[in-house]
């Protein structure tokens, strides 16, 4: 690729790649940014990640990996700001980004890649100042989320919806996680189809790989003969962990003998620090009469998470909205079949009927039926596990980085062509 950028400014305002996934606002996007940046660096592209400083304990710049630098930008108080408060800090954040670039020779950054709409607002202004292409990844779409709200969940604010429209108009190219997201950008936001590229996220196939289930269960403290259902993610209405708990209660109500061996593991934390106890789920488990089968586990690092995937019989992903669903791919890479909602990118992440089962809607009874259909058919469960590994192998991060770098190259070439046409027109 002749037009490969030398250096990219990658913007992630609201969540740092150094944060533990599963805590606060840290999740799949954090994993995405870390892994993509590392693989881009492997291709010879330097990456500088700008993120809001949330503690004074870290230096202004931290080396994440060879060729990958994390820059902490002071914008508002370190603590006490929710994601919804951050629009008020975008001017300060943008100022910090522009000051950093001004310390270098002009043309220091060849391209901007912003992640989530907040970062897109910053990228829009930086693009105008620096005269470089802006690539934007939404990760989630406010209009899509509002169309599929969970009970008790708050709708995305108008500021976000308007901000997303602005970013779609400003970006030179948009990267969608799946073809469905690409079509939603065109249909709901009026994006030019020629400026939308689909690049599937990836999975670390070295870390997330099949292994000995008995050893994994011993590692995480689970009985060797248990029937283990696993939920991984932030504990919030959007991710619908309550659907899994209600499905487990339905399983036991249908067949009380399942209680003896059933284990439901919930790995993750609520918004905020992510380390608080999910008291509402504890109460729900008690009310459903299944507190004895549910285990709540605070967020764990990626290596430990792989053990949880390998220890599980089935990973359950009942989200109301997912632009892709990294949890589903990670679980499958470890050889664990998935029962997931038929929403968004999960239809791409899961090979329905081969590596898992997609469920229409969020009726706990339907999830109970899907789970029982695998637990009660060991040969089918094993076949799904083998197929899951094969399916996940298509989603390595190196392929994601190569496709992303191609989008970068085309954007740089487009800008050069535009400038050449303008030069010719002015002569």
Curated annotation (Swiss-Prot):
One of its GO terms (biological process) is mycothiol biosynthetic process. Its EC number is 2.4.1.250. It catalyses: 1D-myo-inositol 3-phosphate + UDP-N-acetyl-alpha-D-glucosamine = 1D-myo-inositol 2-acetamido-2-deoxy-alpha-D-glucopyranoside 3-phosphate + UDP + H(+). It holds the Pfam family Glyco_trans_4_4. It comes from the Bacteria. UDP-N-acetyl-alpha-D-glucosamine binds at residues 20-21, 28, 234, 239, 300, 322, 330. GO terms for molecular function: acetylglucosaminyltransferase activity; D-inositol-3-phosphate glycosyltransferase activity; magnesium ion binding. InterPro entries: Glyco_trans_1, Glyco_trans_4-like_N, Mycothiol_biosynthesis_MshA. 1D-myo-inositol 3-phosphate binds at residues 14, 25-30, 83, 116, 140, 160. Keywords: Glycosyltransferase, Magnesium, Metal-binding, Transferase. Belongs to the glycosyltransferase group 1 family. MshA subfamily. Catalyzes the transfer of a N-acetyl-glucosamine moiety to 1D-myo-inositol 3-phosphate to produce 1D-myo-inositol 2-acetamido-2-deoxy-glucopyranoside 3-phosphate in the mycothiol biosynthesis pathway. PANTHER family: D-INOSITOL 3-PHOSPHATE GLYCOSYLTRANSFERASE (PTHR12526:SF510), GLYCOSYLTRANSFERASE (PTHR12526). This is D-inositol 3-phosphate glycosyltransferase 2.
């Amino acid at each position: 690729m002749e037009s490969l950028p030398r250096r990219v400014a990658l913007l992630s305002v609201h969540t740092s790649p150094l944060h533990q996934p599963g805590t606060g606002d840290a999740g799949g996007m954090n994993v995405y940014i870390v892994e993509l940046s590392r693989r881009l660096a492997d291709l010879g592209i330097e990456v500088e990640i700008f993120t809001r400083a949330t503690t004074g304990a870290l230096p202004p710049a931290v080396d994440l990996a060879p060729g990958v630098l994390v820059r902490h930008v002071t914008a508002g108080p370190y603590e006490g700001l929710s994601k919804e408060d951050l629009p008020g800090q975008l001017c300060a954040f943008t100022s910090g980004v522009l000051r950093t670039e001004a310390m270098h020779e002009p043309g220091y950054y060849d391209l901007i890649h912003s992640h989530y709409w907040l970062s897109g607002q910053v990228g829009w202004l930086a693009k105008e100042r620096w005269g470089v292409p802006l690539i934007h990844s939404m990760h989630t779409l406010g209009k899509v989320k509002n169309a599929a709200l969970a009970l008790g969940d708050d709708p995305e604010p108008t500021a976000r919806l308007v901000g997303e429209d602005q970013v779609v108009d400003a970006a030179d190219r948009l990267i969608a996680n799946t073809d469905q997201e690409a079509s939603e950008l065109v249909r709901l936001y009026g994006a030019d189809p020629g400026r939308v590229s689909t690049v599937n996220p990836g999975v670390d196939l070295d870390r997330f790989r099949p292994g000995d289930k008995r050893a994994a269960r011993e590692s995480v403290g689970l009985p060797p003969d248990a029937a283990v259902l696993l939920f991984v993610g932030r504990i919030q209405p959007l991710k619908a962990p309550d659907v899994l708990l209600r499905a487990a209660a339905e399983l036991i109500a249908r067949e009380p003998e399942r209680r003896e061996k059933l284990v439901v593991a919930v790995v993750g934390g609520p918004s905020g620090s992510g380390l608080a106890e999910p008291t509402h789920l504890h109460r729900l488990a008690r009310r459903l009469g299944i507190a004895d089968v549910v285990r709540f586990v605070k967020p764990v690092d990626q290596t430990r998470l792989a053990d949880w995937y390998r220890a599980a019989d089935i990973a359950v992903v009942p989200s109301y909205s997912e632009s892709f669903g990294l949890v589903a791919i990670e679980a499958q890479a470890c050889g664990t079949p998935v029962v997931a909602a038929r929403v968004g990118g999960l239809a791409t992440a899961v090979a329905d009927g081969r590596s898992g089962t997609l469920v229409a809607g969020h009726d706990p009874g339907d999830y109970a039926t899907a789970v029982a259909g695998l637990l009660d058919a060991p040969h089918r469960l094993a076949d799904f596990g083998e197929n899951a590994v094969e399916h996940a192998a298509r989603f390595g991060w190196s392929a994601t980085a190569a496709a992303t770098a191609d989008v970068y190259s085309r954007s740089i070439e487009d800008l050069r062509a535009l400038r050449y046409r303008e030069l010719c027109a002015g002569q």
